[in-house]
């Protein structure tokens, strides 16, 4: 390679990933086929517009690629409509929100510190800057969504749009209850399933596709695809909405919001990678993979509970859980730094009603999607949990060095996808 500096850095990242236990809930490992597609010659092609409606010539091949990705996404989720062009989940959310409501309208989303996402109404996001944002949270007692409280807040603020979904919530969300609430206040419903898309596609969690007006997702995380976004619609795809002072079908409004509304040319090499990932997710072994993700996550959570830790909401229904570090008297930031020293990666995370600054936090978030992609089973996951607990409890530098050696020896025996 001519650029030896850059490619040496890439090799360093290869080594880091191979010798590291990856517990960040929003990360995963793609297949070699996905990497091949994303690293292909398709990165050369500019293709503003949509299949058969491009602003450039020479798009007949990428038209077929995007159409294939759309077809597979629709099949995977049982959707009537799919847009595979969003570059990220945040951009998918921006386009979906703008297709349904206009700037200044009211939105109701999950409080960020209770497990929501920046794009669900945070003041530092477009969703809180350009819209009148309100929030709902979890019950102080159960640390789960209180749907009666959501209904009460919705009736008080009368939102134009309700967003259901989360980035650090370990329980299954009842999308039908959210739709009932939305209908009661004449609001649209947007479901953001970025974290649980793989569980929904395989039937382990209830699907919002025919419940919500629009559903958004990322294509990485539990879908094991390239980093990117996705917008889906079911039976509501052809309803008429007021977009840009014109009556449009919802799917047409979404298309316009993605391009030219929020993006220019699509990333055709990434869309090809999405197509590969959707095909892989349609295979029977992907359902087995998701089953193992859930099993591994539960096993780790149970291990922490048995060691005296408090798990937010008492457990997990999906691929992640939150650990309250109060028993140790350390912060999430402390834990993140210590664990990185022993080749374990996760992230500090606020817990509901957290008294600490978001840059410090009282908890950590742990996910099993990535380690499961490397072939770890339930017993392996319990061993991983013990590595984490050992590192968090020790005060010895020598013990941390030993844990790091143990971690490298253990995880290096599992192949990268």
From Swiss-Prot:
Compartments, record wording: Cytoplasm
Keyword Transferase: yes
Pathway: One-carbon metabolism; tetrahydrofolate interconversion; Amino-acid biosynthesis; glycine biosynthesis; glycine from L-serine: step 1/1
EC number(s) from the headed UniProt entry: 2.1.2.1
CDD domains: SHMT
Cofactor: pyridoxal 5'-phosphate
Keyword Transferase: yes
Any one GO molecular function term: glycine hydroxymethyltransferase activity
Catalytic activity: (6R)-5,10-methylene-5,6,7,8-tetrahydrofolate + glycine + H2O = (6S)-5,6,7,8-tetrahydrofolate + L-serine
Modified residues (N6-(pyridoxal phosphate)lysine): 221
Site (Plays an important role in substrate specificity): 220
Binding site for (6S)-5,6,7,8-tetrahydrofolate: 112, 116-118, 247
Chain segments annotated as transmembrane: none
BP GO annotations: glycine biosynthetic process from serine; tetrahydrofolate interconversion
Signal peptide: none
UniProt superkingdom: Bacteria
Cellular compartments per GO CC: cytosol
Primary role: Catalyzes the reversible interconversion of serine and glycine with tetrahydrofolate (THF) serving as the one-carbon carrier. This reaction serves as the major source of one-carbon groups required for the biosynthesis of purines, thymidylate, methionine, and other important biomolecules. Also exhibits THF-independent aldolase activity toward beta-hydroxyamino acids, producing glycine and aldehydes, via a retro-aldol mechanism.
UniProt record similarity statement: Belongs to the SHMT family.
Oligomeric and partner information: Homodimer.
Protein name: Serine hydroxymethyltransferase
Protein species of origin: Borrelia hermsii (strain HS1 / DAH)
């Amino acid at each position: 390679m001519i650029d030896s500096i850059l490619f040496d850095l890439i090799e360093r990242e290869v080594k880091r990933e191979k010798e590291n236990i990856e517990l960040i809930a929003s990360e995963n490992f793609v297949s070699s086929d996905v990497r091949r597609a994303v690293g292909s010659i398709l990165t050369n092609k500019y293709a503003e517009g949509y299949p058969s409606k491009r602003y450039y010539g020479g798009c007949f091949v990428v038209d077929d690629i995007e159409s294939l990705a759309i077809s597979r996404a629709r099949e995977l989720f049982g959707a009537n409509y799919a847009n595979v062009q969003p570059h990220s989940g945040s951009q998918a959310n921006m386009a979906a929100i703008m297709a349904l409501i206009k700037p200044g309208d009211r939105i109701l989303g999950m409080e960020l510190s209770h497990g929501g996402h920046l794009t669900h109404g945070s003041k530092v996001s477009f969703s809180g800057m350009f819209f009148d944002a309100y929030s709902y949270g979890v019950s102080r007692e159960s640390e789960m969504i209180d749907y009666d409280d959501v209904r009460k807040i919705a009736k008080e603020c009368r939102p134009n749009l309700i967003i259901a979904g989360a980035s650090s919530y370990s329980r299954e969300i009842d999308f039908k209850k959210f739709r009932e609430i939305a209908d009661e206040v004449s609001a649209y419903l947007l479901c953001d399933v970025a974290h649980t898309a793989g569980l929904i596609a395989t039937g382990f969690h209830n699907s919002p596709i025919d419940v919500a007006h629009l559903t958004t997702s990322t294509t990485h995380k539990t879908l094991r695809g390239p980093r990117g976004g996705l917008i889906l619609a079911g039976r509501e795809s052809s309803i008429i909405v007021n977009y840009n002072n014109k009556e449009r079908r919802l799917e047409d409004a979404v298309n316009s919001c993605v391009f030219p509304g929020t993006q220019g040319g699509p990333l055709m090499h990434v869309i090809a990678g999405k197509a590969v990932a959707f095909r892989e997710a349609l295979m029977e072994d992907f359902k087995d993979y998701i089953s193992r993700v859930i099993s591994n996550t539960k096993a780790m959570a149970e291990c922490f509970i048995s060691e005296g830790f408090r798990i937010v909401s008492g457990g997990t229904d999906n691929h992640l859980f939150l650990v309250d570090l109060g028993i140790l008297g350390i912060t999430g930031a402390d834990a993140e730094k210590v664990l990185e020293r022993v080749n374990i990666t996760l992230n500090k995370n606020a817990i509901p009603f957290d008294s600490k600054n978001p840059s410090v936090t009282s908890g950590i978030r742990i996910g099993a999607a990535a380690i499961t992609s490397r072939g770890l089973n339930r017993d392996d996951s319990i061993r991983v949990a013990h590595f984490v607990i050992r590192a968090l409890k020790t005060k010895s530098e020598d013990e941390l060095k030993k844990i790091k050696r143990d971690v490298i020896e253990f995880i290096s025996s599992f192949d990268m996808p």
